[in-house]
């Protein structure tokens, strides 16, 4: 531990004691490029699972849906806002992972409380920038909204962003905890010679672990969102938590507590885990694997001379430097 601290001190001296959180234009360009590549790949790879979840949830509720128009067309309906939301979410996720990586390298043991505060901050930032677009993509995919009956407005944006904020907050906290620092710990259990394989498998495992804890709140969030209606004035009408609670209470009264729980566990929970687990495994594996494969400088080959430029900007410290 002492040796590691000494090595990090040398690194800080070579960097001129600049803050690791202040990115140069070169570092920012690399981060933006990496974020875009990872986010688009994740969005394209997981959209089919969103389609399957939509079909599953509508079949469980017995509500007719607009999931029609051919397999590919139906599967990727609403992909544009989903991809844009993925870009925003990816920016938050990759930045969160990068921040934790810098913290580990520069301070080698950040306080546990500080890491959790960072996780909470980034999970809330993710909701703020992407929940509205993700909700629109979901409703568009199932045919609730379309170009004719939906227009962006402050009211509609707020409805889509806040409709399931509470349940998404819990799920997002778990996801970002695993992306930020717990996922690397899981990766350390794999002992392949190539660290890339360890990262991919660690990411996939983290995604499955996250699914076990986030399926219930995500299922509630999706159910609440999918009950959204469009009024005649193109304003969205969402259901309240009180309405959701009333529906669950009526169901429990009708079938009994034990039967309601077993139905939820066997039908809703396990079926959704079967879809959400591979979706999360692919998402986390791509984030961890592509982050490792691309490294901190994916643009190095198309931005020549940058290494020499850095060396000229940060000359080696004098041997007499304390």
Curated annotation (Swiss-Prot):
Matches recorded under InterPro entries: Serine_protease (IPR041000)
Enzyme Commission number(s) of this protein: 3.4.22.-
Gene Ontology cellular-component terms listed: extracellular region; host cell mitochondrial membrane; membrane
Principal cellular location given in the protein's record: secreted
Active site: 68
A biological process from GO: proteolysis
GO molecular function: serine-type peptidase activity
Role noted for this protein: Serine protease effector that inhibits host cell autophagy by targeting SNX17. Localizes to the host endoplasmic reticulum-mitochondria contact site and catalyzes degradation of host SNX17, thereby impairing endoplasmic reticulum-mitochondria communication, leading to inhibit autophagy as well as staurosporine-induced apoptosis.
The protein, known as: Serine protease Lpg1137
Organism name: Legionella pneumophila subsp. pneumophila (strain Philadelphia 1 / ATCC 33152 / DSM 7513)
Lineage, highest ranks first: Bacteria, Pseudomonadati, Pseudomonadota, Gammaproteobacteria, Legionellales
């Amino acid at each position: 531990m002492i040796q590691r601290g000494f090595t990090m001190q040398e690194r800080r001296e070579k960097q001129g004691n600049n803050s690791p959180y202040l990115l140069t234009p070169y570092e920012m360009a690399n981060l933006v490029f990496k974020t875009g590549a990872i986010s688009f790949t994740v969005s394209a790879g997981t959209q089919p699972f969103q389609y399957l979840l939509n079909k599953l949830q509508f079949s469980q509720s017995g509500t007719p849906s607009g999931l029609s128009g051919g397999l590919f067309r139906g599967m990727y309906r609403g992909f544009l806002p989903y991809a844009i939301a993925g870009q925003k979410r990816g920016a938050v996720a990759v930045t969160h992972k990068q921040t934790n990586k810098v913290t580990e390298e520069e301070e080698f043991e950040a306080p546990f409380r500080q890491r959790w505060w960072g996780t909470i901050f980034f999970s809330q930032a993710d909701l703020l920038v992407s929940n509205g677009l993700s909700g629109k993509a979901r409703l568009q995919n199932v045919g609730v909204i379309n170009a004719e009956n939906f227009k962006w407005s402050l009211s509609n944006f707020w409805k889509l962003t806040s409709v399931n904020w509470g349940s998404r907050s819990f799920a997002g906290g778990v996801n970002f905890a695993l992306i930020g620092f717990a996922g690397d710990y899981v990766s350390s259990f794999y002992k392949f010679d190539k660290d890339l394989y360890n990262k991919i498998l660690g990411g996939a495992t983290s995604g499955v672990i996250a699914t076990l804890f986030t399926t219930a709140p995500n299922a509630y969030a999706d159910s609440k969102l999918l009950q959204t209606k469009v009024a005649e004035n193109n304003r969205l009408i969402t259901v309240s938590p009180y309405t959701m609670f009333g529906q669950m209470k009526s169901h429990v009264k009708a079938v009994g507590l034990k039967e309601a729980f077993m139905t939820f566990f066997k039908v809703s929970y396990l079926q959704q885990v079967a879809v959400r687990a591979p979706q999360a495994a692919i998402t986390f594996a791509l984030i961890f694997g592509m982050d490792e494969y691309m490294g901190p400088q994916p643009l190095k080959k198309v931005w020549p001379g940058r290494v020499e430029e850095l060396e000229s900007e940060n000359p080696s410290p004098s041997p007499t430097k304390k």
